């Protein structure tokens, strides 16, 4: 192919001429150091290229060579437990080759070419196969059984397939198609900007159980759903994302650190290998893929890292796995779009963001979902996309937050005031919402308890009434309230502090199963039922609220381990006995 030459360099944007043979979104190599870039605009023979590496020292006249193929990722065994940069270069391999810093023009294969994987066939000679069918499996980690699928566009009859140890570039199967014999390797490539195909999309119904009480009870996200976590600085977005990555009951986690601090990725690398998955007992790292594109890495690669992450997630979804994708933060990605748009001299939209911000965000979130995968067995897979948004100054009316809210169905609004009061997770229960409540409510009623929806509705009503009553208290004081209204304030305080507050760094409180959440919520609300019974019998509210030891036990129920959940029921029994005793002693006197 003809080689072009650079005529202008503007930060990560390079303009080259003599590129008439290239196509938009082609991958190109720029300069003597062969920096990786991607064509984002074509005008005649001039191409605008966003370069994914530092362009310092690059000048006019430098050669530009097109590869003739789009930016693609390598998909195969070796993805799990790996850490990549925004364009899927393995950071560990780069560190061994070049030290602590990314060297310009360094070329490293995404997947290890030397490691051998044991391949076990699932089909045999002369079987008919088509795109998406599982040819065999590779046990990648103790948790993940990596399924090797027929690549898209191939259909025919298996000629050869053998069990054995192979590298990702070895041919494991030959398929006779109408276009000749096609060789299938353990690895396949896929362009990042193109969604992987599936048979049909399904309606998400089952919840992604996160172990975080405010999320699972009040604002659940379905497996295959999309959620946004907007919040100002210091409100706990990253900790919420880490908690979901640690405890969410997805089988695979893809964590994208997009333009955030390097320390946060270091935390993930240090914590995840030590943490045990409550379902498998194995390290959480054994089901995790990390994509680190920290704030000091080239801006253009931020734009690619979101697509790299979702393509890897789609690959595991196609195997029939439930995948959780965390993007922290989509605001940094939008800022990268804004910078490139400005350098391209495009007409700016709101706050300088490009006019196509909404459609780019939609392209990303719409690749989430629950689907029937390609292949004969009609297996189901799901991607749950959870994006953090960092609005400047916590202003939720800014363009990235508003564009995101138009697309996602779950909104967990983090509140700086709650964070300053040390209430974590700082999700504001009054302005957050989930549009999956009805379908997940039916699932909860069937699988956890028939009372689930009623208890949740009651608790939410109490919290909303508390907000109204606080307005009255501020105006005329608490003495103006009736005893039953003052009781509501006490119960609301108990819901907030004993149920919704959760310590991410406590061994027990960091994760609550659905059964434990149900028992805890029932216990908190049974305090209201029993207290109202006592009020009707003539007991003064002060007598009920002064049952300090019992209320302390209710507050400490969150620290009861999962295997000792029967103790929560015992506290409920004790509560009934104490109220009966109180009615016997006080009720008659005051009646």
UniProtKB/Swiss-Prot annotation:
Gene3D superfamilies: 2.40.30.20, 2.40.50.100, Bovine Mitochondrial F1-atpase, Atp Synthase Beta Chain, Chain D, domain 3, P-loop containing nucleotide triphosphate hydrolases. It is an enzyme of class 7 (translocase). Keywords: ATP synthesis, ATP-binding, Hydrogen ion transport, Ion transport, Nucleotide-binding, Translocase, Transport. Its EC number is 7.1.2.2. GO terms for biological process: proton motive force-driven plasma membrane ATP synthesis. It catalyses: ATP + H2O + 4 H(+)(in) = ADP + phosphate + 5 H(+)(out). The keyword Cell inner membrane does not apply. CDD domains: ATP-synt_V_A-type_alpha_C (cd18111), ATP-synt_V_A-type_alpha_N (cd18119), V_A-ATPase_A (cd01134). ATP binds at residues 231-238. Pfam families: ATP-synt_ab, ATP-synt_ab_N, ATP-synt_ab_Xtn, ATP-synt_VA_C. Coiled coil: none annotated. The keyword Transport applies. Belongs to the ATPase alpha/beta chains family. This is V-type ATP synthase alpha chain. It comes from Clostridium novyi (strain NT). The gene is atpA.
């Amino acid at each position: 192919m003809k080689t072009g030459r650079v005529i202008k360099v503007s930060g990560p944007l390079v303009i080259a001429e003599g590129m008439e043979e290239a196509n938009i979104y082609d991958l190109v190599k720029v300069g003597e150091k062969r920096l990786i870039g991607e064509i984002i605009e074509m005008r005649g023979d001039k191409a605008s290229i966003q370069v994914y590496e530092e362009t310092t020292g690059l000048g006019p006249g430098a050669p530009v060579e097109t590869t003739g193929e789009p930016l693609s990722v390598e998909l195969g065994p070796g993805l799990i437990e790996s850490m990549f940069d925004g364009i899927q270069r393995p950071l560990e391999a780069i560190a061994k080759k070049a030290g602590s810093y990314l060297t310009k023009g360094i070329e490293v294969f995404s997947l290890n070419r030397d490691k051998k994987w044991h391949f076990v066939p699932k089909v045999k000679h002369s079987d008919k196969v088509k795109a998406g069918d599982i040819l065999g499996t590779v046990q990648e980690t103790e948790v993940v059984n990596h399924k090797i699928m027929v690549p898209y566009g191939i259909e025919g009859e298996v000629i050869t397939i053998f069990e054995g140890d192979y590298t990702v570039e070895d041919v494991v199967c030959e398929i006779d198609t109408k276009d000749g014999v096609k060789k299938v390797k353990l690895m396949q490539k896929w362009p990042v900007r193109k969604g992987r195909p599936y048979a049909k999309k399904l309606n998400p119904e089952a919840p992604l159980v996160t172990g975080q009480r405010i999320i699972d009870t009040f604002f659940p996200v379905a497996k295959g759903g999309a959620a946004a976590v907007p919040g100002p600085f210091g409100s706990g977005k990253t900790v919420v994302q880490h908690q979901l990555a640690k405890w969410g009951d997805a089988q695979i986690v893809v964590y994208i650190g997009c333009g955030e601090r390097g320390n946060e990725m270091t935390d993930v690398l240090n914590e995840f290998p030590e943490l045990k998955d409550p379902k498998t007992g194995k390290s959480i790292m054994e089901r995790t893929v990390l994509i680190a594109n920290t704030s000091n890495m080239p801006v253009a690669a931020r734009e690619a890292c979101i697509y790299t992450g979702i393509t890897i997630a789609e690959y595991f979804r196609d195997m029939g796995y439930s995948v959780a994708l965390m993007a922290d933060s989509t605001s940094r990605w939008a800022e990268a779009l804004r910078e490139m748009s400005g350098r391209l001299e495009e007409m700016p939209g709101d706050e300088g963001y490009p006019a196509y911000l909404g459609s780019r965000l939609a392209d990303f979130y719409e690749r989430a979902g629950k689907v029937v995968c390609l292949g004969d067995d009609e297996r189901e897979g799901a991607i749950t996309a959870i994006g953090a948004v960092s609005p400047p100054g916590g202003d939720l009316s800014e363009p990235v937050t508003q564009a995101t809210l138009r697309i996602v169905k779950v909104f967990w609004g983090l509140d700086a005031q709650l964070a300053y009061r040390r209430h974590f997770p700082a999700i504001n229960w009054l302005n957050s919402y989930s549009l999956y409540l009805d379908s997940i409510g039916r699932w909860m009623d069937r699988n956890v308890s028939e009372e689930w929806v009623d208890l949740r509705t009651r608790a939410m009503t109490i919290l909303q009434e508390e907000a109204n009553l606080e307005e009255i208290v501020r105006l005329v004081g608490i003495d103006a309230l009736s005893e039953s209204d003052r009781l509501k304030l006490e119960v609301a305080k108990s819901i907030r502090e004993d149920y919704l507050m959760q310590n991410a760094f406590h061994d027990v409180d960091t994760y609550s199963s659905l059964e434990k959440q149900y028992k805890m919520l029932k216990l908190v609300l049974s305090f209201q039922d029993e207290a109202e019974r006592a009020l009707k019998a003539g007991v003064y509210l002060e007598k009920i609220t002064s049952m300090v030891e019992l209320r302390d036990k209710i507050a400490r129920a969150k620290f009861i381990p999962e295997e000792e959940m029967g103790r929560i029921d015992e506290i409920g029994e004790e509560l009934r006995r104490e109220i009966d005793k109180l009615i016997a002693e006080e009720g008659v006197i005051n009646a």
